[in-house]
Regions:
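Accessory, non-ATPase domains that flank or precede helicase/AAA+ motor cores in DNA-metabolism machines
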Residues: 1-195, 200, 205-219
């Protein structure tokens, strides 16, 4: 074939086809309305981010307080700055409905990885992230290794979950790894939980982390 190409008899076009776990849904860009408590948290985060403050924050909110909606507002702000975002969710909670909520907000900017994907599928998603084809990667602790060139935020939902600890070699804790990764990339970290780990809560109470509270359930 190469001689035919060199003689101009035929032409070859190369198109990359990714093994993409397609997310289907009824469109996206649904409107998310924040209540005053959620708004206060999101606005404080955005103001500090705009000031160049990169830190770890603990979003301590009761079940049903709307932490996910706050994450989305934070993510939207970081994406508007041309940065990229990793969202860690425990594998057991990484359901279709959970991912769909993000997809409806950010559309095809969102990709997902999980343990059920083949090595090739995971490779494709990492390559898309590196090229900038996706800007929000959702997954379990392994999503931390997404090669985003402009990482701006790491969200760890249900940060108290033991699933964030890897007991196999290489051993690591997703929270500690995320903080180091954020430091290297000039990014922020947001930890979320209704029952935060003792380590995270202690660091928040002693000023090592910024502490946000959502004390009441969000009204539907």
């Amino acid at each position: 074939m190469k001689p035919l190409v060199e003689k101009g008899i035929i032409s070859v076009e190369v198109e990359t086809m990714y093994r993409n776990p397609e997310i289907s849904g009824n469109g996206y860009k649904t409107v998310v309305s924040l209540n005053p408590a959620q708004t206060a948290v999101a606005e404080d985060f955005k103001n500090r981010y705009d000031q160049g403050i990169r830190e770890t924050s603990l979003l301590y909110g009761v079940t049903g307080s709307g932490k996910t909606e706050v994450y989305m507002e934070m993510i939207r702000h970081v994406l508007a700055k041309g940065r990229q975002v990793i969202v860690l969710i425990p594998e057991i909670a990484l359901t279709y409905q959970t991912v769909l909520r993000f997809y409806r907000q950010f559309g095809r900017q969102v990709s997902v990885i999980n343990s059920r994907m083949s090595a090739g599928e995971r490779y494709d998603q990492f390559e898309r992230a590196e090229k900038g084809d996706v800007t929000v990667m959702i997954g379990p602790r392994s999503a931390l290794f997404t090669p985003f060139p402009k990482l701006g935020l790491i969200v760890i939902d249900e940060e108290h979950e033991s699933a964030y600890k890897s007991e196999l070699s290489p051993r690591y804790h997703a929270r500690e790894t995320a903080e180091e990764l954020a430091r290297m990339n000039g990014a922020s970290v947001v930890l979320g939980s209704a029952t935060p780990s003792l380590e995270a809560y202690t660091r928040a109470k002693t000023g090592q982390y910024r502490l946000y509270r959502l004390a009441e359930r969000a009204k539907k």
